[in-house]
């Protein structure tokens, strides 16, 4: 199993994420088991961490935030997220990691 998969027509990207809220900055940090670990600067209060996650993913995948759907894990660190209509693949989440 992988931390990502594609829907039938490849216009849907499904991500399995492990999210760590309350970090110094928002960034993808690497693979943790079968999930991609993402650190979020936002705290898990009043949905702020989920909003920060969807904003981060929308920016990385160059899609509107409405194209990012949290399918599972609204109140968990383990999340399943769908990205619709992105021309970018999952490798865009690692762009900052390679630059360092």
From Swiss-Prot:
Concerning SMART domains, the annotation shows: DUF167 (SM01152)
* Alphabetized InterPro entries for the sequence: DUF167, YggU-like_sf
Pfam families from the xrefs? DUF167
GO cellular component terms, alphabetically, are: cytoplasm
Family per similarity comment:
Belongs to the UPF0235 family.
Protein name per the record: UPF0235 protein NE0395
Q: Which organism is it from?
A: Nitrosomonas europaea (strain ATCC 19718 / CIP 103999 / KCTC 2705 / NBRC 14298)
Lineage here is:
Bacteria, Pseudomonadati, Pseudomonadota, Betaproteobacteria, Nitrosomonadales
């Amino acid at each position: 199993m992988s931390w990502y998969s594609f829907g039938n027509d490849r216009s849907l990207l499904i991500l399995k994420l492990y999210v760590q809220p309350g970090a110094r900055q928002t960034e993808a940090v690497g693979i943790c088991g079968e999930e991609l670990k993402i650190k979020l600067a936002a705290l898990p209060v009043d949905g702020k961490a989920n909003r920060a996650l969807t904003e981060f993913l929308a920016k990385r995948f160059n899609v509107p935030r409405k194209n990012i759907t949290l399918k599972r894990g609204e109140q968990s660190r383990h999340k399943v997220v769908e990205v619709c209509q992105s021309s970018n693949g999952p490798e865009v989440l690692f762009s900052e990691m390679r630059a360092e």
